[in-house]
Amino acid sequence: MSNFVAEKSIAAVRAVDEVRDGMLVGLGTGSTAAYAVKSLSERIKHGLRITAVATSQATEALALRLAVPLVPFQQLSAVDLTIDGADEIDDRFQAIKGGGGALLREKITESASTRVIIIADSSKLVAQLGKFPLPVEVVPFATEFVRARLSALGARVTVREAGGTPFLTDQGNYILDAALDEIPRPREIAAAITTIPGVLEHGLFLDEIDTIMIARGDMVEVRHRGEA
């Protein structure tokens, strides 16, 4: 097991320690979030009583396989706690997410959550966002139009593919990966992208995150929004 893989697991275990009986828990998507689902499953085996909501079909399949009880988000208006990973996160609790292709459902679920914990290995904490391409979910009809608008913002844009064809999100949409190299003013970029017709969501998470748990070796650094 590589250091980064071990760190993901350690951070996940620490985050799942925050889950209490009776909670409705949001389950993120991606390799790091999968460790949280596995850790949650172990706690359920030892008597923890919770229900969960998945942010993707992939996470739903994993949760069902591990006997984590699920409810559909369509029946919900609020979530107690969501645990998820990030592709990049900075000291201001701003993150790029969507490498796993579930940014729209993640944004909805985390906006509905009383608390959001982001777990990550030490490589994900950055001084400035932007080295990881910014995912943008788009209506397929608007792909080339949105690509041109993103290019006008200075991005190098590619259509995400899987098996030689465009990757489809769980909603049947496309993802454009916008490489910007650096994003010194994330709110300006987020606002500009949001105004483009055909864009459904972008992967900048600027206000949703409450707690960051970054694993470094065998230790987990916990940071809370608003702390000095």
Curated annotation (Swiss-Prot):
Keywords: Isomerase
Claim: Isomerase is one of the keywords in the record: yes
CDD domains: RPI_A (cd01398)
Pfam families assigned: Rib_5-P_isom_A (PF06026)
Matching SUPFAM superfamilies: D-ribose-5-phosphate isomerase (RpiA), lid domain (SSF75445), NagB/RpiA/CoA transferase-like (SSF100950)
A Gene Ontology biological process term: D-ribose metabolic process
Catalysed reactions listed for this entry: aldehydo-D-ribose 5-phosphate = D-ribulose 5-phosphate
Sequence positions that bind substrate: T29, G30, S31, T32, D84, G85, A86, D87, K97, G98, G99, G100, K124
Underlying gene: rpiA
HAMAP family attached to this UniProt entry: Rib_5P_isom_A (MF_00170)
Record's protein name: Ribose-5-phosphate isomerase A
Family statement: Belongs to the ribose 5-phosphate isomerase family.
GO function terms (MF aspect): ribose-5-phosphate isomerase activity
Highest taxon listed in the record's lineage: Bacteria
Natural source organism: Sphingopyxis alaskensis (strain DSM 13593 / LMG 18877 / RB2256) (Sphingomonas alaskensis)
Positions of disulphide bridges: none
Function: Catalyzes the reversible conversion of ribose-5-phosphate to ribulose 5-phosphate.
Pathway connected to this protein: Carbohydrate degradation; pentose phosphate pathway; D-ribose 5-phosphate from D-ribulose 5-phosphate (non-oxidative stage): step 1/1
UniProt-listed Gene3D superfamilies: 3.30.70.260, 3.40.50.1360
A single GO cellular-component term on record: cytosol
Subunit structure: Homodimer.
